Amino acid sequence: MSKSADLFAKAQKIIPGGVNSPVRAFAGVGGSPLFIERADGAYIFDADGKAYIDYVGSWGPMILGHNHVAVRDAVIKAAQQGLSFGAPTEMEITMAELVSKLVPSMEQIRMVSSGTEATMSAIRLARGFTNRDKIIKFEGCYHGHADCLLVKAGSGALTLGQPNSPGVPADFAKHTLTCTYNDLETVREAFAAHPEQIACIIVEPVAGNMNCIPPVPGFLEGLRTICDDFGALLILDEVMTGFRVSEGGAQGYYNIKPDLTTLGKIIGGGMPVGAFGGRKDIMQYIAPTGPVYQAGTLSGNPVAMAAGHACLSVLTEEGNEKRLANTTKILANGFKSLADKYNIPLAINQVGGMFGFFFTEQKTVTSYADVTKCDIERFKRFFNLMLKSGVYLAPSAYEACFTSLAHGDKEIEATLNAAERAFATLAKEANA
């Protein structure tokens, strides 16, 4: 038995399911999850000392690569001054100014401690500002585990086949309207049925929790127009896409101006952090300047702020955005070429530093319905073949994968060599 398997057995005795977040349990791919001992650059190292080229990146935050010296040094320096004060610090201002500079729609910003907290708070603010109760989300999109958002959700909820969670009262769920991602007609129908009751639309501008689904042309623009027509707010959930799709997030990439934006992952450089922000008149509606209450003991944590500022400072150095996108494109195209070589039906989506692949006969994958038609068993087999070759992909067919600035030619070549062996095995098994 590997040390990871031994630790997993031990963990299940004291931690529900043996993990502190469901998708880590490998339920979507089988076997025991890797228990990680350390990480550096493009690599993670499991409890048995085996190295893996990592395309999970702590589910997105590690865009510079693991254990980057600038982030590590910033964390050490900040920690030496104290871990938490429960009072304002100058670094909170510095960090907020940097984020606002990169994402101009965020005229004012409130720091929180997680992406879930950011989306939950943004929705509360939207409801308070508009004096409306209902919200629109999209099937297969995941915005954290707040009660009102666990309705036809993606990510780990989708992996486990439980997109609607027990424990969410019907009275909460009834205010959440679910539409079809990349289908504006379903949104128009929702507003036609509830014209003055919908506070906001919340959407992942690139859906990363049902794998990787970019918006079709006109979709985000259509959402903006519909919100304007009906007096609702548009919230872009950029917890995953923020600074990964482009320096200005998906909203910069697609030239869409939301009313509110939520961030997480990358802005903490690996530390727990989230943020929400937007139009000043809306943000002024939150306490202490307005009536909508939101608070957090560790919000704006000085160590997390230092880590995030260091991460964004390096990330936005000239040439890094283009290099990350090019690396990801080369990798995605390589996967597709190899799949074609071995007659394995595969569709690939890629935007900036995120990508996803789908074992399907379909040429394009643009919706939750498309994703659910993919060959999950073939994905499981491919994942485990790649893992055996030292390549760690997202352990679920419903999760996006991520590259980092630490992924170079060596890592891409090794990954594609492993992929060729895996596709060859899949082809052989299909013809057996």
Swiss-Prot record:
CDD domains: OAT_like. It is an enzyme of class 5 (isomerase). Homodimer. This is Glutamate-1-semialdehyde 2,1-aminomutase. Pathway: Porphyrin-containing compound metabolism; protoporphyrin-IX biosynthesis; 5-aminolevulinate from L-glutamyl-tRNA(Glu): step 2/2. It comes from Photobacterium profundum (strain SS9). GO terms for biological process: protoporphyrinogen IX biosynthetic process. NCBIfam families: hemL (TIGR00713), PRK00062.1 (NF000818). Belongs to the class-III pyridoxal-phosphate-dependent aminotransferase family. HemL subfamily. It is found in: Cytoplasm. It catalyses: (S)-4-amino-5-oxopentanoate = 5-aminolevulinate. The gene is hemL. The modification N6-(pyridoxal phosphate)lysine is found at K265. PANTHER family: GLUTAMATE-1-SEMIALDEHYDE 2,1-AMINOMUTASE, GLUTAMATE-1-SEMIALDEHYDE 2,1-AMINOMUTASE 1, CHLOROPLASTIC-RELATED. GO terms for cellular component: cytoplasm. Keywords: Cytoplasm, Isomerase, Porphyrin biosynthesis, Pyridoxal phosphate.
